[in-house]
Amino acid sequence: MYSMLDTDMKSPVQQSNALSGGPGTPGGKGNTSTPDQDRVKRPMNAFMVWSRGQRRKMAQENPKMHNSEISKRLGADWKLLSDSEKRPFIDEAKRLRAVHMKDYPDYKYRPRRKTKTLLKKDKYSLPGNLLAPGINPVSGGVGQRIDTYPHMNGWTNGAYSLMQEQLGYGQHPAMNSSQMQQIQHRYDMGGLQYSPMMSSAQTYMNAAASTYSMSPAYNQQSSTVMSLASMGSVVKSEPSSPPPAITSHTQRACLGDLRDMISMYLPPGGDAGDHSSLQNSRLHSVHQHYQSAGGPGVNGTVPLTHI
């Protein structure tokens, strides 16, 4: 065992002396023309000194074993050795390092760096050249990500994508004014179709506002208009036309009802002769109000002559 260890220790020393050009060799350090000395190798460490003979022996025993598998097994065997067994190889590695520093004082370790430009180019390319030759792969990937999640951008009915497409068309230099007008008419916000629930709710709010603004005598007409509008909004909501103008007869009737209601709650004014006529007008207005607002059940139940 010790004889094999001595031969393993002597062989790297002789090789290092041959490479560095020892003091007895005529080649010396000045011989730099050979291709072996163009690149200076690092000095061997303790594991490399020990694994030289072990690697050769294991390769002879297992000729089909790969070099990486041999290195794994040698590393596991090196860890199992004790410090006393590693000591001679550590001392030999220190001696080789001292000789290397003496022969090459200006030596600096420069590891070989792999170029990563090809990896960056292949990172953004699709398999099979699916993209067109004039399309940037990075911009195409960003557009695909935006189109993949249209429901998370907060825009309903695809309005965000429509706006982006309209902006893209607007920036095109070869587009004339007629095409731009067609695009603007196509993406007009007034022509967008809303859902039936939204349109019916909007019609209900508009009808409620018109109900409060009109007199109670015309509630039936407004409810009919509201129902017809809600039925029409289920099919398609069109731009609503302005409401018809109130005629003079309707305005006069509303003003008359308003005067009757005000005069009923105000104290009687003027002389005593006007009191009876004012009271009769009050009774007539109250009777007419209940007759128009109530149903047929209210008209014949409570007589108003006892007031």
From Swiss-Prot:
It is found in: Nucleus; Cytoplasm. Gene3D superfamilies: High mobility group box domain. Pfam families: HMG_box, SOXp. Residues 1-43 are annotated as: Disordered. GO terms for cellular component: cytoplasm; nucleus. Residues 40-108 bind DNA. GO terms for molecular function: beta-catenin binding; DNA-binding transcription activator activity, RNA polymerase II-specific; RNA polymerase II cis-regulatory region sequence-specific DNA binding; sequence-specific DNA binding. One of its GO terms (biological process) is brain development. Its main location: nucleus. Keywords: Cytoplasm, Developmental protein, DNA-binding, Gastrulation, Nucleus, Repressor, Transcription, Transcription regulation. InterPro entries: HMG_box_dom, HMG_box_dom_sf, SOX_fam, SRY-related_HMG-box_TF-like. A motif (9aaTAD) lies at residues 257-268. Residues 21-30 have a biased composition (Gly residues). Interacts with ctnnb1. The 9aaTAD motif is a transactivation domain present in a large number of yeast and animal transcription factors. Transcription factor with sequence-specific DNA binding activity. Binds to the consensus sequence 5'-[AT][AT]CAA[AT]G-3', showing a preference for 5'-AACAAT-3' and 5'-AACAAAG-3'. Inhibits beta-catenin-mediated dorsal axis specification by binding to sites within the promoter of the beta-catenin-regulated gene nodal5. Acts maternally as a transcriptional repressor of nodal5 and nodal6 to restrict their expression to the vegetal hemisphere of early embryos and thus establish germ layer formation. This is Transcription factor Sox-3-B. It comes from Xenopus laevis (African clawed frog). The gene is sox3-b.
